[in-house]
Amino acid sequence: MLPPELSEDRCSLRPNEDRLCVTVEMPPHGDPTFYRSIIRSKARLTYGEAERRQAEPAIVAALELTDRLTAGMRDRRFARGALRIESPEINFEFDGKGGVARAWKESEPTAHRLIEELMIAANEAVAELLSSRKREALYRVHERPDPTAIELLLKKLADLGVPTPPAPEQLSPATAAQVAADVSERVMDYVRRSGRGVEAFPSLVLRSLKQARYHPENLGHAGLASRAYCHFTSPIRRYPDLVVHRALLKELGLSDEPPPADLEGLAEHTSTQERAAAQVEYLADELCLGWLLDATLYERGWDDPFEGEIVGMIASGLFIRFGDVFEGYLPVRRLTGDYFELNDLGTAMAGRRGGRMYRLGDPIEVLVEKIEKAEGKVELSEAGRTRK
């Protein structure tokens, strides 16, 4: 991230001020063009504000064509084999004194989908140009999944009663990617229709895939079903985007700046830093949720149970999502009435004697036993039993 003076002022799209840009112009039919440009934005809006403004009569007509275009782009992306997994992010509201006032999950607004499709198209166009001319840059690559991982995913989903496509007798990486895309669509459809496994089943699909990363060569992006992909649209937020901008401008004859000397090392470094930043973000979410849960229990009482969903399991216990945004750990030692063992697929925990079973995606009622706010850890116990 650039210093705030640059990222929030000099390089930021401030309303009614000129800013230097690089434009990707993409006609519905024909090749894209790339050029330096100047932009003067009229407003700085959050996605929520943009969503509300879209209903204004003067804006409806202007966005109607854009909506149709981006909807078509989205449909074509899924038709060519892009993954269809929805993972709503947790949003926080703070009280102005450093405390967390509330947290909620929000489905993707229309304004976000519109911007997302245009950014994907721009990123693809730039990557296609650089790749076709064998230019060095930092590509965003997502390699095809390991066939054995997809075979295991199919077995897990079948064991959980989730409809899956028939698996080919032999899976190559290419067919594994196609099966993964098909599975992602079926899982999301099943979750919407049944209301079961809302958190657990999409997570199973994601964990069966390889991680996206940066690489100096174009290896394609399986998740987006893109032949070539890069990060181009956020040069004030991500360093790889800045490298791509420089590569594009050099290719267009608008800059003489050479590419970095060690692109391979830079790709590894930026990929590592991205994962580290994601881990910090996850920890920050856990800490905020721990404090919010403690405040919530202070008001409602610790004896009031939560409805939850089993979203993960290991031999020593269950991971539960509850209260929509909170997550906690239910140790197996707190499961009473039997001795429970994890099955070979890691999809269920069954009692040796009575046969009582806990499965991924099952509902479960829990009580909070302990919160370690400094670590964001929550320990749970079972308030009621899942189905037998």
Where are these regions (language model features)?
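Conserved, carboxylate-rich catalytic/transport cores that coordinate ions
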Residues: 1-388
